[in-house]
Amino acid sequence: MVLCGDMHRVFEIGPVFRAEDSNTNRHLCEFTGLDIEMVFYEHYFEILDLLADMFVAIFNGLEERYAKELKVVGEQYPFEPFKCKNVRLSFKEGVKLLADNGFTQDPLQDLSTENEKTLGRLVREKYDTDFYMLYGYPTNARPFYTMLDPHDDNYTNSYDFFMRGEEITSGAQRIHEPEFLAKRAAHHGIPVATIQEYIDAFKYGCPPHGGCGIGLERVVKLYCGIRNIRKCSLFPRDPKRLRP
């Protein structure tokens, strides 16, 4: 809605509350989120360019400004230095890399957690980096408001970023045409009447855009090689912990 008001880049940092029953070492019910939405002019890769540059700047800044603090963390929680190169692969290339090394992955389904970690290891071996991005995810693995690939509607204009074999953010080009948005919602079995206000917002005119949401505690966890995300939050909240 803000982009409809001709603000072409929107950034927000703040608390996020997610009532998700995910008892894992990488999920929290409360965390600090960095949300980004932006207009692009020629191709949704413009979003990937900005995000990649942002992450690289963050990682380089941590090394330059907080080397002393990172050393202290490493004394209690030893970790390998984070390797960062700007590597971009298509989802199909990721599937091929897995297949070439004897791992099975359906090209029209999302990566399993196990295959995410395996692919992260293979990417590190091949490209010498702990940071990379995959783009062009299958349509079956994305929500209804994700723009389809204009050349193959089995895939989408979407992307994930990874650190040490774990996803740190998912994003995509959003559908900005109200008629197509309603059609995709109906295709997914969502009653259009229940989201009519959302669809109506695009009737005022909205440029092509996309973005993502990033959980900063997970970024810290993976940068420092910490096994449990609860170590990265002062007062962690998960489905079984409300206090202190």
Where are these regions (language model features)?
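Class II aminoacyl-tRNA synthetase catalytic cores and aaRS-like
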Residues: M1-P244
